[in-house]
Amino acid sequence: MSAQTANGDATEELAAPPVVDQPTWEAALAELRTREKAATRELDAIAAARRRLPMVELPDYVLEGADGPIRLADVFEGKRQLIVYNHMWFPGETWQCPGCTGFTSQFTRLEFLDSYDARFVIVTQGPIDEALAYKARVGNKMTWYSTADSPFGTDMGAPPGGGFQVNVFFRIGDTVYRTYNTQGRGTEQLSYSFPLIDLLPYGRQEEWQDSPEGWPQSPTYSGWASSEAYARYAEAT
């Protein structure tokens, strides 16, 4: 359709949703809402099944934190539950994975997890001094630990040079158990960026998405901000 100026003059061809009257719009929205509610109920059922997963006992791993070596059981800081994001790491690189950087930069206030007896932290294969320097460089607010000298990362599916992972743990005394793991698109529901973008008429504007003809589309992830951009965002605040 043609975009229009304030006085109604056509300016250029622009991919846009069709214009309809209010009742037609409300009917289309109601039809979509039925599907959204069904998806929400299915997600509730999946979460219920997740709560019923068994767990596996882990060895007594030792990671490296800002204050030195720390047992995995102590990373919980007294909490019963722990979520770990295994951040990708490329040795010797100034700028690390932009996807991991962007994903973890969303989480600036995690105190709300206290009420749920839980923590959320980052573990990476990078040496702790380099990891903490990178955390500061990009303005990341999460707590970081290193698995560079521990088999923990590899055992959790995030070996040196490997991809990102999300792992969830449960603690009974000093014994830690692994309860859940996901990776790839399984992490999207943990992010607010994708749900926000998916509300937009154009969506993520990526080639794989099912969009109307003429909608802007680019290679997958091409719209993501670079790690350098997150550093600039941090400097601006």
Question: What does each of the following model-derived ranges do?
Answer:
Residues S2-Y116, A133-A136, T143, S150-T237:
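Non-globular targeting/processing and membrane-anchoring segments
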